[in-house]
Amino acid sequence: MNRNVSASTMTRGQCLRSLAAGSSLLPGLLSELLGEDSGIRERNPLSPGIPDGRPRASRVIMLYMSGGVSHVDTWDPRPKLMRDAGKTVTVNEFQGRKGSFSMYLKSPQWTFRPRGKCGTQVSDLFPRTAACVDDLCVIRSMKSNHTNHYEATLGMHTGSFTFARPSMGSWISYGLGTLNRNLPSFIVLAPQTPYAGGQVWGSDFLPGAHQGTRVVPGTEPVANIQRRSASEELQLLELGLLARMNQRHRAARGDDALLEARMQSFKTAFGMQKEMPEVFDLSDETESTFRSYGLQPGSTSGFAWQCLVARRLAERGVRFVELIDTGSSGNWDAHGDMQTHAPLAANVDQPTAALLQDLKQRGMLEDTLVVWTTEFGRTPFNAAPQAAGREHHHWVFSSWLAGGGVRGGMTWGASDDYGIEVAADEVHVHDFHATILHLLGLDHTRLTWRNSGRDFRLTDVHGRVVHEILS
Protein backbone atom coordinates (compact mmCIF):
# COMPACT_ATOMS: atom_id res chain seq x y z
CA MET A 1 0.00 0.00 0.00
CA ASN A 2 1.24 3.48 -0.89
CA ARG A 3 1.21 5.54 2.32
CA ASN A 4 2.41 8.74 0.61
CA VAL A 5 -0.86 10.62 0.16
CA SER A 6 -0.44 13.84 -1.80
CA ALA A 7 -2.39 17.00 -0.98
CA SER A 8 -4.23 16.76 -4.28
CA THR A 9 -5.60 13.25 -3.49
CA MET A 10 -6.23 13.66 0.25
CA THR A 11 -9.93 13.36 1.08
CA ARG A 12 -11.76 15.68 3.43
CA GLY A 13 -12.00 12.87 6.01
CA GLN A 14 -8.28 12.12 5.81
CA CYS A 15 -7.47 15.78 6.24
CA LEU A 16 -9.70 16.11 9.31
CA ARG A 17 -8.27 12.95 10.87
CA SER A 18 -4.72 14.24 10.33
CA LEU A 19 -5.60 17.59 11.88
CA ALA A 20 -7.21 15.87 14.84
CA ALA A 21 -4.16 13.70 15.33
CA GLY A 22 -1.99 16.78 15.13
CA SER A 23 -4.05 18.60 17.74
CA SER A 24 -3.67 15.65 20.10
CA LEU A 25 0.07 16.19 19.98
CA LEU A 26 -0.15 19.84 21.01
CA PRO A 27 0.53 19.42 24.76
CA GLY A 28 3.59 17.26 24.12
CA LEU A 29 4.71 19.45 21.24
CA LEU A 30 4.44 22.61 23.31
CA SER A 31 6.43 20.94 26.08
CA GLU A 32 9.05 19.91 23.54
CA LEU A 33 9.26 23.34 21.95
CA LEU A 34 9.67 24.95 25.35
CA GLY A 35 12.32 22.40 26.35
CA GLU A 36 10.42 20.94 29.30
CA ASP A 37 10.92 17.25 28.49
CA SER A 38 14.21 15.81 29.71
CA GLY A 39 14.16 13.00 27.18
CA ILE A 40 13.82 15.50 24.36
CA ARG A 41 16.68 17.54 25.83
CA GLU A 42 18.90 14.47 25.53
CA ARG A 43 18.04 14.18 21.84
CA ASN A 44 18.52 17.89 21.21
CA PRO A 45 21.96 18.47 19.62
CA LEU A 46 21.97 21.98 21.08
CA SER A 47 21.61 20.83 24.69
CA PRO A 48 24.36 22.32 26.88
CA GLY A 49 27.52 20.23 26.71
CA ILE A 50 30.06 19.42 29.40
CA PRO A 51 33.46 21.12 28.92
CA ASP A 52 36.63 19.02 29.05
CA GLY A 53 38.28 21.35 31.54
CA ARG A 54 37.56 24.40 33.63
CA PRO A 55 36.16 27.07 31.31
CA ARG A 56 37.31 30.66 31.68
CA ALA A 57 34.67 31.89 29.22
CA SER A 58 31.15 30.73 28.49
CA ARG A 59 30.61 32.64 25.23
CA VAL A 60 32.52 34.33 22.40
CA ILE A 61 31.96 37.57 20.51
CA MET A 62 34.18 37.66 17.43
CA LEU A 63 34.79 40.94 15.58
CA TYR A 64 36.01 40.11 12.08
CA MET A 65 37.53 42.80 9.87
CA SER A 66 37.21 41.63 6.27
CA GLY A 67 39.90 42.34 3.70
CA GLY A 68 43.17 42.36 5.64
CA VAL A 69 43.97 45.08 8.19
CA SER A 70 47.50 46.48 8.05
CA HIS A 71 49.30 45.46 11.24
CA VAL A 72 52.06 48.08 10.83
CA ASP A 73 49.44 50.86 10.72
CA THR A 74 47.34 49.71 13.68
CA TRP A 75 48.61 47.37 16.42
CA ASP A 76 52.30 46.73 15.62
CA PRO A 77 54.59 49.80 15.90
CA ARG A 78 57.73 49.43 13.79
CA PRO A 79 59.94 52.50 14.43
CA LYS A 80 62.73 51.17 12.22
CA LEU A 81 60.26 50.83 9.36
CA MET A 82 59.54 54.53 9.72
CA ARG A 83 63.23 55.45 9.85
CA ASP A 84 64.18 53.31 6.85
CA ALA A 85 61.16 54.11 4.67
CA GLY A 86 62.18 54.33 1.01
CA LYS A 87 65.11 51.96 1.37
CA THR A 88 65.07 48.62 -0.41
CA VAL A 89 64.78 45.21 1.17
CA THR A 90 64.91 41.73 -0.39
CA VAL A 91 61.96 39.42 0.28
CA ASN A 92 61.37 35.80 -0.71
CA GLU A 93 57.69 36.09 -1.61
CA PHE A 94 55.47 38.76 -3.13
CA GLN A 95 51.79 38.48 -4.06
CA GLY A 96 51.94 34.69 -3.69
CA ARG A 97 54.99 34.26 -5.93
CA LYS A 98 58.20 32.70 -4.62
CA GLY A 99 61.58 34.14 -5.54
CA SER A 100 63.88 37.02 -4.69
CA PHE A 101 62.24 40.44 -4.90
CA SER A 102 63.69 43.87 -4.20
CA MET A 103 61.05 46.00 -2.48
CA TYR A 104 60.77 49.54 -1.14
CA LEU A 105 59.93 49.92 2.55
CA LYS A 106 56.79 51.95 3.20
CA SER A 107 56.41 53.96 6.40
CA PRO A 108 53.46 53.52 8.80
CA GLN A 109 50.79 56.05 7.86
CA TRP A 110 49.52 56.77 11.38
CA THR A 111 51.29 57.73 14.59
CA PHE A 112 51.63 55.19 17.40
CA ARG A 113 51.32 56.31 21.03
CA PRO A 114 51.56 54.56 24.42
CA ARG A 115 48.06 53.88 25.76
CA GLY A 116 46.56 53.05 29.14
CA LYS A 117 48.43 52.11 32.29
CA CYS A 118 50.19 49.27 30.48
CA GLY A 119 51.70 51.60 27.88
CA THR A 120 50.93 49.37 24.89
CA GLN A 121 51.43 51.36 21.70
CA VAL A 122 48.43 51.62 19.38
CA SER A 123 48.07 53.85 16.34
CA ASP A 124 45.77 56.85 16.05
CA LEU A 125 43.46 54.82 13.79
CA PHE A 126 41.78 53.31 16.88
CA PRO A 127 41.79 56.00 19.62
CA ARG A 128 38.68 54.74 21.45
CA THR A 129 39.60 51.05 21.37
CA ALA A 130 43.11 52.07 22.41
CA ALA A 131 41.59 53.56 25.57
CA CYS A 132 40.56 49.98 26.49
CA VAL A 133 44.05 48.59 25.97
CA ASP A 134 44.44 47.61 29.64
CA ASP A 135 41.81 44.93 28.94
CA LEU A 136 43.39 43.74 25.68
CA CYS A 137 45.99 41.11 24.90
CA VAL A 138 47.44 42.22 21.56
CA ILE A 139 49.02 39.37 19.60
CA ARG A 140 51.67 40.73 17.21
CA SER A 141 52.89 37.38 15.88
CA MET A 142 49.87 35.92 14.09
CA LYS A 143 50.58 33.81 11.01
CA SER A 144 48.36 32.35 8.29
CA ASN A 145 48.97 29.86 5.48
CA HIS A 146 47.67 31.78 2.51
CA THR A 147 47.92 35.16 0.85
CA ASN A 148 44.57 35.07 -0.99
CA HIS A 149 41.38 36.39 0.60
CA TYR A 150 39.27 33.30 -0.04
CA GLU A 151 41.71 30.77 1.40
CA ALA A 152 42.84 33.00 4.28
CA THR A 153 39.25 33.83 5.27
CA LEU A 154 38.33 30.16 5.11
CA GLY A 155 41.36 29.27 7.23
CA MET A 156 40.65 31.86 9.90
CA HIS A 157 37.08 30.61 10.23
CA THR A 158 37.43 26.86 9.74
CA GLY A 159 41.09 25.96 10.24
CA SER A 160 41.21 24.66 6.66
CA PHE A 161 42.77 26.78 3.92
CA THR A 162 41.74 24.50 1.07
CA PHE A 163 38.47 22.64 1.63
CA ALA A 164 35.20 23.55 3.29
CA ARG A 165 35.13 22.43 6.91
CA PRO A 166 32.92 23.27 9.91
CA SER A 167 33.43 26.83 11.13
CA MET A 168 34.81 27.61 14.58
CA GLY A 169 31.37 28.73 15.73
CA SER A 170 29.92 25.39 14.62
CA TRP A 171 32.62 23.46 16.49
CA ILE A 172 31.91 25.47 19.64
CA SER A 173 28.17 24.91 19.26
CA TYR A 174 28.82 21.18 18.83
CA GLY A 175 31.05 21.10 21.91
CA LEU A 176 28.99 23.27 24.24
CA GLY A 177 25.45 23.56 22.87
CA THR A 178 23.32 26.57 23.72
CA LEU A 179 22.32 28.21 26.98
CA ASN A 180 19.00 29.34 25.47
CA ARG A 181 16.89 26.82 23.57
CA ASN A 182 14.86 29.63 22.01
CA LEU A 183 17.89 30.98 20.15
CA PRO A 184 20.53 29.44 17.89
CA SER A 185 23.85 28.73 19.55
CA PHE A 186 25.77 30.42 16.73
CA ILE A 187 24.71 33.71 15.13
CA VAL A 188 26.53 35.79 12.51
CA LEU A 189 25.78 39.49 12.04
CA ALA A 190 26.86 40.12 8.44
CA PRO A 191 25.64 42.98 6.24
CA GLN A 192 27.38 41.49 3.19
CA THR A 193 28.58 38.07 2.10
CA PRO A 194 32.27 37.76 3.05
CA TYR A 195 35.08 36.13 1.10
CA ALA A 196 34.47 32.34 1.02
CA GLY A 197 30.74 33.03 1.35
CA GLY A 198 28.49 31.14 3.73
CA GLN A 199 31.20 28.55 4.35
CA VAL A 200 32.58 30.83 7.06
CA TRP A 201 29.53 30.02 9.20
CA GLY A 202 28.68 26.61 7.75
CA SER A 203 28.67 23.36 9.72
CA ASP A 204 29.77 21.14 6.80
CA PHE A 205 29.76 17.53 8.11
CA LEU A 206 28.65 18.49 11.64
CA PRO A 207 24.89 18.29 12.24
CA GLY A 208 23.07 21.17 10.56
CA ALA A 209 21.78 22.41 13.91
CA HIS A 210 25.28 23.80 14.54
CA GLN A 211 25.57 26.02 11.48
CA GLY A 212 25.48 29.76 12.00
CA THR A 213 22.26 31.73 11.62
CA ARG A 214 22.91 34.85 9.58
CA VAL A 215 21.41 38.14 10.73
CA VAL A 216 21.38 40.91 8.11
CA PRO A 217 21.07 44.42 9.57
CA GLY A 218 17.88 46.08 8.38
CA THR A 219 14.14 46.07 8.95
CA GLU A 220 13.95 42.24 8.84
CA PRO A 221 17.25 40.98 10.30
CA VAL A 222 16.16 37.33 10.14
CA ALA A 223 14.03 36.32 7.18
CA ASN A 224 10.53 35.01 7.98
CA ILE A 225 10.89 35.64 11.72
CA GLN A 226 7.38 37.06 11.86
CA ARG A 227 4.61 34.50 12.26
CA ARG A 228 2.69 33.91 9.02
CA SER A 229 -0.13 32.03 10.74
CA ALA A 230 -3.21 33.87 11.96
CA SER A 231 -2.46 32.98 15.57
CA GLU A 232 -0.06 31.07 17.79
CA GLU A 233 -2.74 28.43 18.33
CA LEU A 234 -3.04 27.81 14.60
CA GLN A 235 0.72 27.66 14.24
CA LEU A 236 0.90 25.08 17.04
CA LEU A 237 -1.73 23.03 15.22
CA GLU A 238 0.34 23.20 12.04
CA LEU A 239 3.50 22.25 13.92
CA GLY A 240 1.69 19.37 15.61
CA LEU A 241 0.72 17.93 12.25
CA LEU A 242 4.22 18.48 10.90
CA ALA A 243 5.81 16.86 13.97
CA ARG A 244 3.61 13.78 13.58
CA MET A 245 4.56 13.42 9.92
CA ASN A 246 8.26 13.94 10.63
CA GLN A 247 8.26 11.43 13.48
CA ARG A 248 6.64 8.84 11.25
CA HIS A 249 9.16 9.61 8.52
CA ARG A 250 12.06 9.33 10.99
CA ALA A 251 10.82 5.97 12.26
CA ALA A 252 10.81 4.65 8.70
CA ARG A 253 14.26 6.00 7.81
CA GLY A 254 16.25 5.33 10.99
CA ASP A 255 19.18 7.60 11.78
CA ASP A 256 19.23 10.55 9.38
CA ALA A 257 21.31 13.56 10.41
CA LEU A 258 19.76 15.86 7.81
CA LEU A 259 16.23 14.96 8.87
CA GLU A 260 17.11 15.42 12.54
CA ALA A 261 18.62 18.82 11.76
CA ARG A 262 15.50 19.87 9.85
CA MET A 263 13.24 18.76 12.70
CA GLN A 264 15.43 20.64 15.18
CA SER A 265 15.27 23.74 12.99
CA PHE A 266 11.48 23.88 13.37
CA LYS A 267 11.81 23.85 17.17
CA THR A 268 14.49 26.53 17.12
CA ALA A 269 12.48 28.65 14.69
CA PHE A 270 9.44 28.50 16.96
CA GLY A 271 11.53 29.71 19.88
CA MET A 272 13.14 32.41 17.74
CA GLN A 273 9.73 33.82 16.86
CA LYS A 274 9.19 34.43 20.54
CA GLU A 275 12.63 35.75 21.52
CA MET A 276 14.35 37.23 18.45
CA PRO A 277 11.99 40.24 18.11
CA GLU A 278 12.85 41.13 21.70
CA VAL A 279 16.58 40.99 20.89
CA PHE A 280 16.15 43.44 18.02
CA ASP A 281 13.82 45.75 19.95
CA LEU A 282 16.27 48.29 21.37
CA SER A 283 13.59 50.48 22.95
CA ASP A 284 14.65 49.40 26.45
CA GLU A 285 18.21 50.69 25.95
CA THR A 286 19.12 54.03 27.56
CA GLU A 287 20.08 57.20 25.73
CA SER A 288 23.56 56.97 27.22
CA THR A 289 23.95 53.47 25.76
CA PHE A 290 23.02 54.72 22.30
CA ARG A 291 25.49 57.60 22.65
CA SER A 292 28.31 55.34 23.80
CA TYR A 293 27.90 53.04 20.79
CA GLY A 294 27.41 55.98 18.41
CA LEU A 295 24.03 54.60 17.39
CA GLN A 296 21.01 56.69 16.48
CA PRO A 297 17.79 55.48 18.18
CA GLY A 298 15.68 53.67 15.61
CA SER A 299 18.66 52.68 13.47
CA THR A 300 18.72 49.05 12.35
CA SER A 301 22.05 48.91 10.54
CA GLY A 302 25.75 49.68 10.88
CA PHE A 303 28.53 48.24 12.99
CA ALA A 304 27.27 50.07 16.08
CA TRP A 305 23.93 48.25 15.74
CA GLN A 306 25.78 44.96 15.28
CA CYS A 307 27.80 45.51 18.47
CA LEU A 308 24.78 46.40 20.60
CA VAL A 309 22.78 43.45 19.27
CA ALA A 310 25.79 41.19 19.91
CA ARG A 311 25.77 42.19 23.56
CA ARG A 312 22.04 41.46 23.78
CA LEU A 313 22.53 38.04 22.17
CA ALA A 314 25.38 37.24 24.55
CA GLU A 315 23.17 38.24 27.49
CA ARG A 316 20.58 35.74 26.31
CA GLY A 317 22.94 32.79 26.15
CA VAL A 318 24.10 32.61 22.53
CA ARG A 319 27.44 30.80 22.63
CA PHE A 320 29.14 32.31 19.59
CA VAL A 321 28.31 35.65 17.99
CA GLU A 322 30.37 36.84 15.03
CA LEU A 323 30.27 40.36 13.63
CA ILE A 324 31.60 40.84 10.09
CA ASP A 325 32.11 44.54 9.45
CA THR A 326 31.96 44.49 5.65
CA GLY A 327 32.13 41.79 3.00
CA SER A 328 34.05 40.97 -0.16
CA SER A 329 33.92 44.62 -1.31
CA GLY A 330 34.34 48.04 0.28
CA ASN A 331 36.58 46.49 2.93
CA TRP A 332 40.11 46.77 4.36
CA ASP A 333 41.76 45.54 1.15
CA ALA A 334 43.87 48.67 0.64
CA HIS A 335 45.83 47.92 -2.54
CA GLY A 336 45.39 51.38 -3.99
CA ASP A 337 45.47 53.70 -0.99
CA MET A 338 46.10 53.09 2.69
CA GLN A 339 43.92 56.08 3.55
CA THR A 340 40.87 53.89 2.91
CA HIS A 341 41.65 52.41 6.34
CA ALA A 342 40.59 55.69 8.00
CA PRO A 343 36.80 55.59 7.39
CA LEU A 344 36.69 51.85 8.05
CA ALA A 345 38.45 52.32 11.38
CA ALA A 346 36.16 55.22 12.29
CA ASN A 347 33.17 52.96 11.60
CA VAL A 348 34.26 50.22 14.02
CA ASP A 349 36.35 52.04 16.64
CA GLN A 350 33.67 53.65 18.83
CA PRO A 351 31.25 50.69 18.86
CA THR A 352 34.07 48.24 19.59
CA ALA A 353 35.18 50.29 22.59
CA ALA A 354 31.57 50.70 23.72
CA LEU A 355 31.01 46.94 23.53
CA LEU A 356 34.06 46.25 25.69
CA GLN A 357 33.05 48.90 28.24
CA ASP A 358 29.42 47.76 28.25
CA LEU A 359 30.37 44.13 28.87
CA LYS A 360 32.73 45.20 31.63
CA GLN A 361 30.16 47.40 33.37
CA ARG A 362 27.62 44.56 33.31
CA GLY A 363 30.11 42.06 34.72
CA MET A 364 30.00 40.06 31.49
CA LEU A 365 33.56 40.58 30.28
CA GLU A 366 34.84 38.12 32.87
CA ASP A 367 33.19 35.19 31.09
CA THR A 368 32.83 36.62 27.58
CA LEU A 369 35.81 36.20 25.26
CA VAL A 370 36.03 39.05 22.74
CA VAL A 371 38.09 38.24 19.65
CA TRP A 372 39.24 40.88 17.13
CA THR A 373 40.94 39.61 13.98
CA THR A 374 41.32 39.75 10.22
CA GLU A 375 42.47 37.21 7.61
CA PHE A 376 46.03 38.58 7.20
CA GLY A 377 48.06 41.78 7.40
CA ARG A 378 49.49 44.02 4.70
CA THR A 379 52.99 44.36 3.30
CA PRO A 380 55.39 46.82 4.97
CA PHE A 381 56.90 47.27 1.47
CA ASN A 382 55.88 47.81 -2.13
CA ALA A 383 57.27 47.20 -5.60
CA ALA A 384 57.13 50.93 -6.41
CA PRO A 385 58.57 53.60 -4.09
CA GLN A 386 55.56 55.91 -4.35
CA ALA A 387 52.81 53.26 -4.09
CA ALA A 388 49.99 54.50 -1.84
CA GLY A 389 48.59 51.12 -0.80
CA ARG A 390 49.85 47.83 0.59
CA GLU A 391 49.52 44.23 -0.65
CA HIS A 392 48.39 41.05 1.13
CA HIS A 393 50.75 39.74 3.81
CA HIS A 394 50.16 36.45 5.65
CA TRP A 395 53.63 36.00 7.17
CA VAL A 396 52.76 38.09 10.21
CA PHE A 397 49.78 40.18 11.34
CA SER A 398 47.99 41.26 14.51
CA SER A 399 44.87 40.23 16.43
CA TRP A 400 43.69 40.82 19.98
CA LEU A 401 41.69 39.06 22.69
CA ALA A 402 39.89 40.50 25.71
CA GLY A 403 37.99 39.15 28.72
CA GLY A 404 37.16 35.48 29.24
CA GLY A 405 40.34 34.40 31.03
CA VAL A 406 42.83 36.45 28.98
CA ARG A 407 45.48 38.65 30.60
CA GLY A 408 44.75 42.26 29.73
CA GLY A 409 47.25 45.04 29.27
CA MET A 410 49.84 42.90 27.53
CA THR A 411 51.27 42.11 24.12
CA TRP A 412 52.40 38.71 22.94
CA GLY A 413 54.85 37.84 20.20
CA ALA A 414 56.75 40.16 17.92
CA SER A 415 57.40 40.77 14.27
CA ASP A 416 60.86 41.65 12.98
CA ASP A 417 62.15 45.22 12.68
CA TYR A 418 60.14 45.90 9.54
CA GLY A 419 57.04 43.82 10.32
CA ILE A 420 57.82 41.34 7.55
CA GLU A 421 58.03 38.06 9.48
CA VAL A 422 57.45 36.67 12.96
CA ALA A 423 60.49 37.28 15.14
CA ALA A 424 59.27 35.72 18.40
CA ASP A 425 56.46 33.51 19.74
CA GLU A 426 54.56 32.71 16.55
CA VAL A 427 50.81 32.23 16.95
CA HIS A 428 49.55 30.35 13.92
CA VAL A 429 45.84 30.38 13.15
CA HIS A 430 45.70 26.82 14.54
CA ASP A 431 47.23 28.04 17.82
CA PHE A 432 44.74 30.90 17.90
CA HIS A 433 41.86 28.44 17.56
CA ALA A 434 43.30 26.03 20.13
CA THR A 435 43.58 28.87 22.65
CA ILE A 436 40.01 30.05 22.07
CA LEU A 437 38.68 26.50 22.57
CA HIS A 438 40.80 26.09 25.71
CA LEU A 439 39.34 29.26 27.22
CA LEU A 440 35.89 27.73 26.71
CA GLY A 441 36.98 24.55 28.49
CA LEU A 442 37.34 22.54 25.27
CA ASP A 443 40.40 20.43 24.46
CA HIS A 444 41.11 21.03 20.77
CA THR A 445 42.63 17.54 20.43
CA ARG A 446 39.48 15.85 21.78
CA LEU A 447 36.82 17.94 20.04
CA THR A 448 36.49 15.67 17.01
CA TRP A 449 33.96 14.34 14.51
CA ARG A 450 34.48 11.18 12.49
CA ASN A 451 33.89 11.72 8.79
CA SER A 452 34.97 9.67 5.77
CA GLY A 453 36.98 7.30 7.93
CA ARG A 454 39.02 9.81 9.93
CA ASP A 455 38.60 12.08 12.93
CA PHE A 456 38.44 15.76 12.04
CA ARG A 457 38.97 18.70 14.36
CA LEU A 458 39.14 22.49 14.10
CA THR A 459 42.94 22.52 14.46
CA ASP A 460 43.53 19.55 12.13
CA VAL A 461 46.70 17.87 13.51
CA HIS A 462 48.22 21.14 14.72
CA GLY A 463 47.63 23.76 17.37
CA ARG A 464 49.24 24.82 20.65
CA VAL A 465 47.38 26.57 23.45
CA VAL A 466 49.15 29.86 24.19
CA HIS A 467 49.11 29.46 27.98
CA GLU A 468 51.33 32.51 28.44
CA ILE A 469 48.47 34.91 27.69
CA LEU A 470 45.96 33.31 30.08
CA SER A 471 45.13 34.93 33.40
Name these PLM-found stretches:
Residues 1-471:
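Ligand-binding pockets and gating/stacking loops
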